[in-house]
A protein has these predicted regions:
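Intrinsic-disorder-linked linear interaction elements in eukaryotic regulatory proteins
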Residues: 1-86
């Protein structure tokens, strides 16, 4: 959990983790999808709706390709998208 004043540093760390995972592990690795979801949660916590939605949608797209739209992670990501959109 991050205090709002620490958000820029946390955002950079989460973003770097995601970029490294994408580069070295690819989207086939579950932890890459989770890292994208976590960055989306951080954006959402700080009321950055568009950034959060972008992360959740990207993670959802890769999760559906990997495990199908009925997977637990895909359903969780859809819930996040729904909450942020409302």
């Amino acid at each position: 959990y991050v205090k709002l004043e620490n958000y820029p540093m946390a955002k950079e760390a989460f973003f770097r983790e995601l970029e490294l995972r994408k580069k070295y592990l690819g989207w086939e690795d579950e932890d890459t999808i989770l890292a994208c979801q976590n960055l989306g949660v951080l954006h959402s916590f700080c009321n950055e709706r568009e950034e959060a939605l972008a992360c959740f949608r990207e993670a959802y797209g890769h999760e559906v390709k990997k495990n199908g739209e009925d997977s637990e992670m895909a359903q969780k990501l859809l819930q996040y998208i729904s909450v942020v959109e409302s």
